[in-house]
Amino acid sequence: MTLFGVRWTAAATALYIIAACADVADEAVDAAATTAGPSARLIQLWSAGTPAFGVFVPNERPRGEVAPDGSRLPPLYTAQGGASLAENPLLDYLFLNLEGSYDAEAVAAIVEGLNQSGSDDAPSLLVRISPIERDGAEAARGRVIEALRLGADGVVIPHVRSPEEARLAVSFFADAGADVWSPDNPNGEILAMIMIEDAGALAAVSEIADTPGYSVLACGIGSLSRDLGSREAGEAGTQEVLAHSERVGLPNMITANAQDVEQRLEEGFLGLLMSGLGADEAIRIGRFAVGR
């Protein structure tokens, strides 16, 4: 898959040229990515058409722990947890899911952990905030600005429901002063991700995909399947979104596991997102499949 270009450092460029001559370009891309900063690491992989592998940041709160009144407690994310993830050489990115309950302290904690890890190739951090419709445009705008200010490498806007809402989502990054990586700005450093997760948005996917100024187009297959009424319909919708992301030259992300990661790679997904105890094994399978 051919994607828009990216600014390479002199060292990364030299390494890529040498590797190409030796017919080992995949290894060169990996090496360039691991010597870059977190956001540049993910951008360089995707600019080269190389799949990237990541995980949901795990909730560290002990299972069954509740508040004194018996109510459910929010997820817990710590700097120590972020530092531990940063030491995992398999990870290209982390996906911090704050869709259910936005928490600026969680963003700050994971960023602190990544910064304190001492790792030269710490993964990129993508933060998923709540949908625009849930708390309103101004709340969403403020969260994008805040997450980026705290050090996130990108922000994910879920449940984008129309072309108008897609343009609104992109405007949040402009208001943050973010240098967004996109087909019109291949030298950008921040990732802006839009997710299509309902039937209405799927019907408008072509116009949503054509929205300028964002980095990644993805489909929330679970949410879309529920909205459409079946897993089969959700899968068909996911493939339609993938086709449009490829048409406009953007990477597409999907959840995967050890059983389907090779299939998803063959289909053309460039962002593979794992979870749970089997995440590392699934990533090993995926990396082997693409020669990483």
Residue ranges and their predicted role:
Residues M1-A10:
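Bacterial N-terminal signal peptides that target proteins for export
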